Amino acid sequence: MSEEILINVTPPETRVAVIENGVLQELIIERSCKIGLVGNIYKGQVCRVLPGMQAAFIDIGLPRTAFLHLSDLCSKELEKKGSANIEHYLHEGQHIIVQVFKDPLGTKGARLTTDISIPSRFQVYMPYSNNVGVSQRIECGEERVRLKNCLEKFKKENECGGFIARTAAECVEDAVLMADMEFLLKLWESIRTKIATAAPKQFIHKDLPLSVRTLRDLYREGIERIRVDSKETYHRLVEFAEIFAPEIVPVIEHYTGECPVFDIYSVEDELEKALARKVKLKSGGHLVFDQTESMTTVDVNTGGYVGGRNLEETIFKTNLEAAQAIARQLRLRNLGGIIIIDFIDMKGEEHKQQVLQAFERHLEKDRAKSKITEVSILGLVEMTRKRTRESLEHILCEPCSACGGRGVLKTAESVCLEIFREIIREVRQYKVQQILVLASNEVAEMLLDEKADMLTELEAFLNVQIKFRSESGYNQEQYDVVLL
């Protein structure tokens, strides 16, 4: 499998595209006017404790207060007190060091934790933890033992917090890992110095910019190229790589081609498709994605694909294709939270298991943690996917001003009948002789064409003259009834 990363940099935003076998798999966008908060550390102030929710609202200097749940308190502190009551840990006015682990979303504030974690290329340092762990993606038993021994040795010698070896640490020499952990300790010391003098509600530390985080978090062995179209960003990445990851330097390229870097693999076209509700499958079937406040639903349909004579085999093949497409779309659209998938009903238990196993296999490529909880009695696949940043739709779109975010508009006929009722109401109340109706082009056209006979009858019934004026700036649901 060939893999590469494209980085597109402009003053307003940075975009990173992960390409696998020539196909866009993941897209991350960071805008200068709205940089993500995940990883940022603040000195917050408790403004409200909610015992009923076992949570607290923390003021960290943002427009909306952030949310801290009991389960997100430092594990060391929880073990020490052993209480399940938030009031035993926090009180109003208390100053507390917190880190954002989930960006604000919609009307919800940021989610916080007091279990601070600082990532590097190979490890994650947790200053308030005693634990040592190894990424689950490292499967070799001997390598897991080696890494754990290395981390525990360093922890014991330096009497510091806990560490987790990241996937990139696999097969890396102990000396390199030790140097990486030394760097993390020095970084934490500089953060502690800032904490000591910081005022409440003050920002303490922020994570690296997206372009540099790409090297730290997205690069792995097998990625052939990292192409960046900004000379300044290219030099910054090379400088970072020379210090922290020398093996990456040869794969970083400054892209100077005539066409935009995202046009190499038609990223812009794929981006437009990722915002669509319907996703076509190669077989002729399609997926339908619907996002709500509480969950995302995915419906699988055969569409025009009828296959051969065996209907069950046709459904099975469509579901297999859908399993791969859904896993890709969840990653590309960055959909998180509760996700319900309605695969096409299959009679055979073996086919059901094969589709579920294929889906789980495709999900393994995703960096975000996901969990398939169960298949419901109705045959729906229920799963969760960890959400730390906004979905693609939330970043790039806003609710439709015409429909108010419903996704549908009243038909022109419905609006016409609504106008008739409004006219009757106004005439009976104010006894007018003339009325002017302002409406959209579509509605005005229908009133003067298909509804012309009804209009004539209404004028005779009410003994009133009704005039119309088409307003090009009105959406289909907009109209005004003006008394003359």
Locations of regions flagged by a protein language model:
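Charged, low-complexity terminal tails
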Residues: M1-T113
